[in-house]
Structures are given as structure tokens and as C-alpha cells.
């Protein structure tokens, strides 16, 4: 977790960079048009966040057909915020990409989110489903206080949580919020059908990892006795991707899921990608509650299985058993939840 000094340093640095940003005419053609901005759009290599951005824009295009959906990459936030503010009217809609970064673990993104909310005080703002986690460190407590102060002051802000722990925490700090699934769960990427073979392992190797290297090695060895085992992480080494590049990367990983007999993962969107492609999946917990919390939305689909205890024998047994597929039933429930968001934000 970041120290208070580091958080303050980055906050001041971001504010100065935004204040001294050079003017740009890139958005001038949008002046006078009805716009829906997608702020903090993921143009970096986390395909989970990229998928959230994609799904959010798809949903907005259906719900607000009379609005132009404007993708604002997170990498352009500081340099373009003033220009965007100047071309927006009070009738334009501001949306903020969902995810798992309302925290001091990814404090730089949380600082940017607060800057966006402050910049558009006269606009309707929708913050798509988030996982919230602030540590008990001095830095975490400060950022949590800033979040409460910033978000509670806005008169037309809709905040949404994607699991019950975040929802309850938001309520505890007096934020009015909705409980909704991760927006990626609204997608259907089960087509085109392809022949399935082998197992895809999608496992973390970062600060949220919880599986030991020895466990992963032994699991791979056991699985390799009966299956071809491939690796495909939801994190790729790319920055500053265009919208077309993002969609290409998403199609590649969705195709990988569709062509696998099983996906084994400890990544939230590894689990969700398996769900939306109709792929049997075993998912392990990570070092926070977001996987367990989000799994509750899809636990009855019949082909995605959360294993709280990482036991290799149990994994092998589960893979050997048949699965059912209740995607359509669960998908209808998930999509019905977002009707609530549409009603709340159209008032």
C-alpha cells in the first residue's frame, strides 16, 4: 500500500499537470452535441479493465442512442480534462469506468477518479461497478476520507458496487450506492462455437497473487498428464492501445477461452471471461474479496466453480465430472439488475 507522503505527492503532481496542460482541439467537433463521456477508459494491458471499458461502452450505446459515446483513455485524463470540461454542457453524461481500483492499492487511479468527479459538478455522473478497498494505513485512511468528502458533495453522482463487501463499506462511509454485477457479465461471447481442447491456465503473478509457485507447478504437472496445458494471462505488456487494438486483444483471449475445455484461474476476469464464453472454469480466491464477492452473481450457472481450498485432488475430481450450462438464465438476471441503473440515472 502507498504511504501518505506518496499519495500526497502524486495528488499534487496530477493537479499541477492538469492545470498546466496545453489546450487541445481534439474534442471541438463535439461541442453542442449530446455526449456521454467514458472517463478513465482502460488503454493499458489489463484486459479485465479493457473488457470493462468495452462492455460499459456497449451498454451505454444501447441505453443512450441519442448520445455520442466518447472514449477518453485514462492516459489522456490529465492532459484532456480541461478541454473536456470546456466542451461539455450540463446535459451531457459523465461515466467512470468500473473495476477494482477504488482503493489505495491503485491510488493513482482513485486520485484521477476524484479529479473527474470534482471537474464535472454540474453533470450527471455514473460510476460503474467497483470494488472498494482502503487499507488501515495512514495513506489508506486519508484516501478513504477524500473519497467520502469528494463523492458525497456531488449532487448527481451514482456510485455502484459489484459485490456486497464494497456495497456495505460504501454505505458505512455514507455514500449512496447501488449493488450491481461487474458490467462484463452483461456480454455474451459464446459465439462462434469452436472445438474445445486442453486447459487454459490464467494465473496471477503480481501483488494480488495468493497461490504459491510450488502449488502452481504441481497443478500444472498433474493436469499435463491428461490435457494440453496453455497459459494466457489477462494482463499483457501493452500501453496506450487504440480502441481497435483493445478489441483485437479481447477477441483473442475470448477465442482462447471458447476453444478450451476448462479455464483455471485466480483472476476475476479470467472467471468472468469463462462465464461469458460458456467455458467450464475453476476459480481460486485472490488476496482480497473481489473474486468471492463477484462469484455470487454467477454461482448457479452450472459450469463455473469457486474453490476456497486449493486442493489439487479436488480440482482433478471436479474436472472429471460433467457440468451444466445455465448461462441464459443467469444472464437474464444480471441484465435485469442494470435496468435499475438505467432507471436511477434517467430521472
What spans do the regions from the language model cover?
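Active-site anion-handling motifs in enzyme catalytic cores
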Residues: 1-347
